[in-house]
Curated annotation (Swiss-Prot):
Taxonomy of the source species: Eukaryota, Sar, Stramenopiles, Oomycota, Peronosporales
Induction: Expression is induced during host plant infection.
Protein name, UniProt field: RxLR effector protein Avr-vnt11
Free-text comment about domains: The RxLR-dEER motif acts to carry the protein into the host cell cytoplasm through binding to cell surface phosphatidylinositol-3-phosphate.
UniProt-annotated location(s): Secreted; Host nucleus, Host nucleolus; Host nucleus; Host cytoplasm
Function per UniProt: Secreted effector that does not produce a statistically significant enhancement of P.infestans colonization of Nicotiana benthamiana leaves.
Amino acid sequence: MRVYAAFVVALVSLLATNSAVLAVTTPTKLAKLTAPEFTDNENRQRRLLRKQEGAELGDEERTSTQNLGNSLMRVFSKEATRKYYLDLFKRADFTANLPKLAKKGGPDRLNDALKKLRKAGISEEKFAELKGAAAKYADDWYRIYGKLDPIRA
């Protein structure tokens, strides 16, 4: 009889626990957790925390970190433009790439690249070398694609 009473008490407590869990997780209460207002409030709180963390920095520290980030961006972007335009000259060295470069602007493209490389801060020796390569490329390009080649004419 005691075993039976313990069994009934266990079932009743299990039933009470399940009903309490079900009462907490009703669809309406779950919907409140996924409602846009809840997520908006959560996002607003996160933004507020980020602002407070940023406010802990002084004005000088904040501007110095911004200036550091800006200068790093300038360094990396200069390096990226320099690399891109130097690659143009590497591609122009191969005669197999002449038709591809001709479709994309011909000698003017390399002359524009020279201007941008000069702004990016390339050395004078390298600039003179690349200028000679651009002139040679322009001669070849005008000879072949300007119908001045005696073989093609």
